[in-house]
């Protein structure tokens, strides 16, 4: 410290130069937080795997939705305006495709226009980052004429609005924090100079910290979140001010004791500096332990550890400069010696706590337990609730919700990826089965894929419809045969009549052959009657075709015979002309009947072929779907395949629309049920070895829930173990760390319970924001441990008076220090309340409630009672070094 004081100006110049250079040349941390600060899931998360598959296939284009809200049902004039808008949007750089709500296809139109025709949806496929999406949205807003109301939304735009909201909240927090600290320090020190010293010291720490973090984030992908800067401000200014108060108070006391300013500074750092180092080191360890978290947004809290490390360096280098330069002027105009007087309230509570420890432990439990028992752990993953409804992306969501339902904006994307083509007639039917399985899950509104591109199944693909068509065809066959029979009966009668005429005229020459032909037709009619009956009773198409082919041959012979008879007649009697003409017509009738039978036979053959193909298809029994070759070649069906497949058919997608808010807890429950339903459905099918993953907002939130829950528990254990080791070494005890940490856990769970009551039960929020439990736990434990260190470190000094007296004296001396520090730290977090960001307000609430609860209840009631209960056991297993405390 003497060397630091000796070279104080050189050190100050280095700190100033370093701050200026870093501020000028380091990357902007705010911009980096906007770019990289979103909740980034690990690569093995289901939603990230879905994104990776689509990205590899070039199918990872972004999508935004333009929503038009009309006062009345859409008119021709508005449709013309929309066509012009669509043409202009297509010309914007970065726009890949615009799906027109004015499509000629009714199914598409129904999907993009509400039933009352007052809400029109226009999906726009784009490329680029979230920032690029925001730029495209701004250009679209400029295109929309003033007489139309349009809002634009999408995951990228919501992310950007959240980033802007957080940025605005940070600016408010910075200003309010500085004002609060100045106000509180004016009250504490009664000086117009002193309040600005912590502001300057912590200000340098903050500027250097955010510059170093910017360099780390930019160059080595150091974890960052949109909350990093806000927490950095609150924590650095909070504990930095506390530490400054600790050192400045001791410095002034030493000045009053007659020491010169240099010696007073040395003593202040030799005594108060020890406590500062221990407390700062504990906070540093607490936040550094978060580097073991798997989730990047949780790891981002390590940035606070960087800030705390810088703060410690600045406190030991820059603050001494002000002490030895200004001396007593640092406290101008106050002349009174500043020292915390004994806290009578804490002394009173301490005496009674050690006298009746069990009673005060019970009182602590009575105060905290009711709140803990009400805790439901209601967590919200709705990022749209984080920002004001004034943002256009949120207004667009509300418009979609009102016009189409909540799930329309962000459907679940089921991605199926295999090693072989999945768009064959043998595999597509299994997609139909998956669709049916998903549709049976509660809260699923519709499923769109190859077999049902608009959410409604293509009926002609299902064998019940196809068999119905075959049945209808066989009915028509029977009717066709009946028509042929009727025609042949007429021909038979005509031939018999002609046979009589020609027989009397020519002594039976031609008459005999005509009679034979008539007899032949009679027999054919009888055969047709049997065929018709057989089709009706058995549906045996193969045998029917053989019989009809034979009958057709017989009709051909009769036709040939009639043509020969016609030639014979033409050379005979005078009336032969009339008979010849009649015979010609009858011959043509036979020909027509034969052609009719051929058509009937062809129809039966087609039906027979379909039935044969069905019998050979392995999918019919499993799925009830059969896709004939002509359907696979159909233009519209090919379009459906192209729309829902990728990677040359090796990948397919299903789009699942829910009837609930895609950000809600209900949606997460639904997607988990969908996963189970799909897994059961593909078991034992050609798709069982395919990768099946899930993308979209709901899938991301499901991953977020699983990861945040497991990683929170894991990180909590790591942090507690780290603190336990540090505190064990510090206090040479394994008992003290246990009840110190237990008291902090009790404080945390009580505080989070009260916060849940306020925001969920009181303000009607869906739940506490998902990041709140983690960040509030980390901050409250890391900062709260400071105050227990303040108290127990003083207890080590006073324990020579006896355990009970040592506790009472420690509480008397440290009560005002701890309460003042807690109020200042709570004040810096209170500065987060006007931010308007739900997560920040809820974290601030937990910290404020926790600090006040810890300072007013847990430390003065619980800790002394526990110390008195353990007695000499407080130093187990190492034992107390008597006379050296």
Swiss-Prot record:
Top-level lineage group: Bacteria
Compartment(s) where it occurs, according to its Swiss-Prot or TrEMBL record: Cell membrane
Keyword annotations from UniProtKB, A to Z: Cell membrane, Membrane, Transmembrane, Transmembrane helix
Gene3D superfamilies: Multidrug efflux transporter AcrB transmembrane domain
Region (Disordered): 498-518
Entry's transmembrane regions: 9-29, 181-201, 202-222, 227-247, 278-298, 304-324, 354-374, 716-736, 740-760, 772-792, 817-837, 847-867
Membrane topology value: Multi-pass membrane protein
GO terms under cellular component: plasma membrane
SUPFAM superfamilies per record: Multidrug efflux transporter AcrB transmembrane domain
Family membership: Belongs to the resistance-nodulation-cell division (RND) (TC 2.A.6) family. MmpL subfamily.
Protein name per its UniProtKB record: Putative membrane protein YdgH
Species: Bacillus subtilis (strain 168)
Source organism phylogeny: Bacteria, Bacillati, Bacillota, Bacilli, Bacillales
